[in-house]
Amino acid sequence: MKVIYLDKLSKIEDEITLAIGNFDGVHLGHQKLLEIVKSYQDTKHAVLTFDPHPRKFFLGDKHKTLFTIKGKISLFEDKGFDYLFIGTFNKEFASLSVDEFVAVLKQLNVKRLVVGKDFRFGFKASGNINDLMKHFEVVVPDTLKSKEAERISTTLIKKYIEEGNIKKANEILGYDYHVLGVVEH
């Protein structure tokens, strides 16, 4: 898998099907997006994520993430993606207009995008799926729900973890929650 930071990007020659998102925790909803990307055989398979997480950029240390960028890289590599694009989320990136963000996607040679129903982009989240549909084929899967009919989200997973309800967190993660770290003694 090629890992490419957008600020070091040159034009991609391969046509790609691209999932875009923060993918913090890579829960069942994220996994559905990734499966859809992998189902297309007419393109290379790619993911665009952000580092730091946009909420961490805006909120600072108040925003906690489930995955580090290293964890995401490892996961997408294990899933057999051809490309992982990383947008360094800083003041410049946050200021991109809708048209500037679309221009970045065109540099990636995107044939098809796979995004969640509530995907927003561009300065102050001014762009939406309709803006993307003007330029690309866009696939938007149905929102996945938990057994309790709650929308599966990283926020819900964090809530369950904070409550100590790891069993419920695991159900919507689709795997056992774990923490990576160094043990000192």
Question: What function would you assign to each model-found segment?
Answer:
Residues M1-H185:
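Nucleotidyltransferase catalytic core that binds NTPs
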